[in-house]
Amino acid sequence: MNEFERVRAYLTDLQDRICAAIEAADGQARFQEDLWQRAEGGGGRTRVLRDGAVFEQAGIGFSDVAGSRLPPSASANRPELAGASWRATGVSLVFHPLNPYVPTTHANVRFFQAQRDGEVVASWFGGGFDLTPFYPFDEDVQHWHRVARDLCAPFGDERYAAHKRWCDEYFFLRHRNETRGVGGLFFDDLHGDFERDFDYLRAVGDGFLDAYLPIVQQRKDTAYGEREREFQLYRRGRYVEFNLVYDRGTLFGLQSGGRSESILMSLPPRVRWEYGFNPEAGSAEARLADYLVPRDWL
């Protein structure tokens, strides 16, 4: 297999493994699969689990798509590639748990190639994972970052610090002056050594469940009431704001004529906004603000 096909094979297997693990953790609902084709080239398989015992909605999509001209969002940092044809493959997921004490999470791993006259002129990896709690626990956040740090260790002493910082900077809502959550890892435009970079992509993809599932198991049976549920729905609004205003993956998908249903799968099934909402001073809800700033968790 060529490089692209090797990455593609890994990603389809990763989607299968994550789906199996999430179904087992939920214990009730199953993923429904939607196979789709893209007119300009390629397609994918979108899988969504709804109304489970643990997950209100969990979406995970695989795609392998191509186009004749890079959209502006993809060539903004690489102007020399403007107008090149392209092919991209990736797995992207967002899980929205029902229990407000279980954090929302997002992960993405992807590979991109730009071509001119049928020849690959550039290729790179991107991805990461991040965590968005509503009622955070220090031990959960520390576990999350410990897994991230440990999977980065074989790739150099600076890898975790650099990609954690990139995550903090990327998942930041400037109009709210807060991070989307407690961070994790984020990277883009990783190139130069295909085998080493592919190893890192696999470490991130394979490490996601190690980081997330123990938190799910720890919090999924925590008792909650209407107050916690209402706060969860309110904070989900921040997720919507980020994805529709800032997220490059969303913008790329929409600009490249992607499949809207799959692109917007990341949005929560239920959400609310409230004008002028301020949590009660000293409350668990007010405490969340202390976590929405970049911090060294380890």
UniProtKB/Swiss-Prot annotation:
It is an enzyme of class 1 (oxidoreductase). Keywords: Cytoplasm, Heme biosynthesis, Metal-binding, Oxidoreductase, Porphyrin biosynthesis. The active site is at residue 106. The record marks 175 as: Important for dimerization. Gene3D superfamilies: Coproporphyrinogen III oxidase, aerobic. Its cofactor is a divalent metal cation. Pathway: Porphyrin-containing compound metabolism; protoporphyrin-IX biosynthesis; protoporphyrinogen-IX from coproporphyrinogen-III (O2 route): step 1/1. PROSITE patterns: COPROGEN_OXIDASE. Its EC number is 1.3.3.3. Substrate binds at residues 92, 108-110, 257-259. Belongs to the aerobic coproporphyrinogen-III oxidase family. This is Oxygen-dependent coproporphyrinogen-III oxidase. It comes from Stenotrophomonas maltophilia (strain R551-3). The lineage of its organism: Bacteria, Pseudomonadati, Pseudomonadota, Gammaproteobacteria, Lysobacterales. The gene is hemF.
